[in-house]
Amino acid sequence: MSVKHTNACGTGTGASPLEAYERAWACDPTSAFGGILAFNEKVDAATARKVTGQFVEAVIAPGFAVEALKVLGKKANLRVMNMDTTGIHKASGFDVRRVMGGLLAQQWDLHRLERDR
């Protein structure tokens, strides 16, 4: 997923993190430029090489291959964050947004996506 200023710019699924990234970026590359990339699986070296060809501020994922960290580490001013997803599907809570005159609240959507569906 690509995000900029808290707005989703694109999402994608694929057989690999690279394929998912390419589909997400293709949704709206102009808006994704300078944003944040979020992955729901470990980032491999091929994905890292592709990511460093774009201008992004940060990459967050539940893990990075050693070679991917080496590749990403060479990109100036790129923030790389490892996200611990242990127990995330057992969490509960609400996403709250302010709107003029009130609040919007909805329960977190923590359903797992399956590749074959």
Task: Please tell me what each predicted stretch does.
Residues 1-117:
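ATP-dependent carboxylate/acyl-activation modules
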